[in-house]
């Protein structure tokens, strides 16, 4: 189950841990590649590249190297013209602390300009904390709230996923 509000090209899917944010993005990616009839023509056949924020942070030796890595990824995504970039666990890019870094100054101008489509996945509580500290972030992102599925929905989702694997 999800709720949405729209304002621009990029969005944040937020929900509890394990609610299915990444699964929703994966299902959307399949719809894009398959040319599903409900997908707007401007999005057809685009590719979604899923990058885990914690993996990117651990791959960089320090903040400067992380900024360079993220800048390179953003530039490559923009130049390819058919990429939607998904930053999984993106809350790690918007806060300071152990295992995280604040890349607001790097990401906000790109989100505001709207030249690159970006999907962020975040834990709901952390998103609310970040958006209170950084109201600009909340205004430039469409919000899609992913609610935990019921036991019946979970069984249906698992059945559908297993059929796809056969």
Indicate residue ranges for each PLM-predicted region.
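Walker A/P-loop nucleotide-binding motif
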Residues: 7-27
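Loop/turn-to-beta-strand initiation segments
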Residues: 9, 46-48, 78-85, 113-120, ...
């Amino acid at each position: 189950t999800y709720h949405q509000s729209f304002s621009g090209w990029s969005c944040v899917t937020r929900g509890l841990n394990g609610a299915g944010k990444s699964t929703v993005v994966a299902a959307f990616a399949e719809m894009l590649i398959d040319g599903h009839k409900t997908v707007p023509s401007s999005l057809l056949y685009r590719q979604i590249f899923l990058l885990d924020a914690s993996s990117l942070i651990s791959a960089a030796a320090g903040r400067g190297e992380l900024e360079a890595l993220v800048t390179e990824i953003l530039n490559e995504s923009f130049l390819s013209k058919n990429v939607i970039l998904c930053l999984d666990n993106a809350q790690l890019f918007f806060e300071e602390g152990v295992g995280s870094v604040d890349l607001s100054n790097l990401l906000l101008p790109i989100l505001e300009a709207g030249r690159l489509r970006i999907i962020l996945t975040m834990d709901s509580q952390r998103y609310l904390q970040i958006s209170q500290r950084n109201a600009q972030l909340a205004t430039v992102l469409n919000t899609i709230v992913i609610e935990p599925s019921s036991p019946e929905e979970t069984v249906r989702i698992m059945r559908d996923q297993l059929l796809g694997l056969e």
